[in-house]
């Protein structure tokens, strides 16, 4: 739920501005990117990783170029997992964190595999959003999770309902 809330609630700019994601992203990231109607307006470019799962500066640059070639527009976000559930590789987030700033991209980090067992430092990574699940190393129950987004970044609501009062206001 938290991944869908963040991925579908962010403003990625005009239609056609793409999203970069690494090839080692968890299905809980890739499935919304490929299937949520709101995200279909923003083509996804998959960034290659080394065999061990590492994302290199060269791969980030190549992914950015590929996205620009395919859409004619700069992508608006980079999504990367801190630690891969497939390879166990822990990304160098300080290296990765500079790339989005240099290229005017939002940086979203999935820390579901690492939160609770490896330090998570959104500030030093310069992350715009950090998303996690509670049922892994945070030892929460299945179905729990959450996210952090930086101050000033807003999410559009995915669900609407009553306020309990002020019914005249829509």
Description of each model-found segment:
Residues 1-170:
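Pyridoxal 5′-phosphate
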């Amino acid at each position: 739920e938290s991944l869908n809330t963040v991925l579908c609630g962010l403003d990625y700019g005009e239609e056609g501005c793409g999203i970069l994601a690494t090839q080692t992203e968890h299905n809980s990231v890739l499935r919304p990117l490929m299937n949520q109607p709101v995200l279909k307006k923003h083509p996804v470019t998959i960034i290659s990783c080394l065999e061990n799962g590492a994302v290199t500066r060269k791969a980030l640059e190549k992914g950015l170029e590929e996205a620009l070639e395919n859409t004619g527009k700069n992508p608006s976000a980079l999504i990367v997992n801190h630690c891969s559930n497939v390879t166990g590789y822990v990304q160098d987030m300080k290296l990765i964190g500079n790339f989005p700033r240099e290229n005017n991209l939002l940086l979203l980090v999935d820390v579901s595999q690492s939160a609770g067992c490896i330090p998570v430092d959104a500030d030093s990574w310069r992350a715009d959003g950090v998303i996690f699940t509670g049922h892994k190393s945070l030892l929460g129950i299945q179905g729990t999770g959450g996210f952090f987004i930086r101050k000033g970044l807003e999410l559009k609501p995915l669900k609407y309902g009553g306020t309990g009062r002020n019914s005249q206001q829509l």
